[in-house]
């Protein structure tokens, strides 16, 4: 079993990575293999709604989105970490997630999702809520902790001084590992829940 962790910060070893690494360590202690991928300062463009992914099975723009897609497909869990930019996630990260979730045809149901956010001071809950939307629209159960998944600090060293934040990340890792194992066991016994054909309703006719 494996979890993929995406560091949405331009800083490879900053606050967001520090939080993700704590989660990864707990996942590993509980039998879950982990991989952390870094967005860094890569130029990841947004979705242009061209619809070519429906024909190709992948995004028409061959950048990091198509590199991450097979890793996501093979993973049992996905942790997305972001610094807070104006009370929201990093724009480069949301570009990646918009295209990653929309362009990939594989079934995401019952992959466990979790969001982690870091900030010097405020905006964390709004950013956290936005990231969770990717999971809930994809039938992905969300792993939680004893508080919303956030850390505070202006540097990686500051984050490690946020004792409550560090504890939140540890608990998140353990809870996510439990969910991944539980879902894998149930899937082995009874398979996935019944999948319905999507019904689309437009409000303007």
Language model regions located:
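Short, hinge-like loop/turn segments at secondary-structure boundaries
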Residues: 51-55, 132, 161-162
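Helix-loop-strand module that forms the ligand-binding subsite of alpha/beta enzymes
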Residues: 56-147
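Glycine-rich phosphate/pyrophosphate-binding loop and the adjoining helix
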Residues: 141-205
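Cysteine-cluster motifs in flexible loop/terminal segments that predominantly coordinate metals
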Residues: 42-72, 199-205
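A short beta-strand-loop structural module common to alpha/beta enzyme folds
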Residues: 32-42
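N-terminal beta1-alpha1 ligand-phosphate binding loop
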Residues: 2-30
